Amino acid sequence: MTELLHLENYSFTYPQQRRPALSHVTLTVPEGAFMVLCGPSGCGKSTLLRQLKTVLAPHGLREGEITFCGTPLSQIPGRRQAAEIGFVQQSPENQVVTDKVWHELAFGLESLGFDTPTIRRRVAEMASFFGIQDWFYKNVTELSGGQKQLLSLASVMVMQPRVLILDEPTSQLDPIAASDFLQTLGRINRELGTTVLLTEHRLEEALPLATHAAVMDG
């Protein structure tokens, strides 16, 4: 497998903190992998994931290097990161930015300046893949928690990212919705070939989907 993301001897310390949140982390995420990042609460999993997209990275002291497709992440323009590095957060309320389902799906592509025919085609493809045609014209406020998180996922996938990063995406979902969401991630990896990097407390459901696992010991 080709190396997609790589951290080499990477450390991060929050401002006004002595102890680093991440200490000398080396990690390789191969292209096409489904990787589950494991470790106890507070070990730095969320902090690590946020280092992988510059716009989400917290302020602090960084040492070591992160590369994406062999290029230092710091040298990759924000537009390319927006398109190629997808990120789904714990709460869809923090990610949804428009009032209508269809507009939420189109918003990212509009922001990057894609033409209307391309936007319509990609939105239609993702609506079909995720089975959300029945609520395509609904207000986002009408959706259940599981539907909102699925919409957040579809809104990221419409960008056709090379890697999909998810930080505890089922933490606010009921068990059935959580199971369905994780199975959808498996489909994305298998059928679309998208690399997946995931932290998830439901390891008994996430690990059977994984091709790789990494453990942080804090």
Predicted features and spans:
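Catalytic Walker B motif of ABC-type/P-loop ATPase nucleotide-binding domains
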Residues: L164-D167
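Conserved ABC ATPase signature
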Residues: N139-L143, Q147
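Conserved ABC transporter NBD signature motif
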Residues: L61-P72
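Conserved catalytic motifs of ABC-family nucleotide-binding domains
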Residues: Q160
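Conserved ABC ATPase "signature" region
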Residues: P117-W135
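H-loop/switch region of ABC-family ATPase nucleotide-binding domains
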Residues: E200-H201
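ABC ATPase NBD coupling module
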Residues: T71-G86
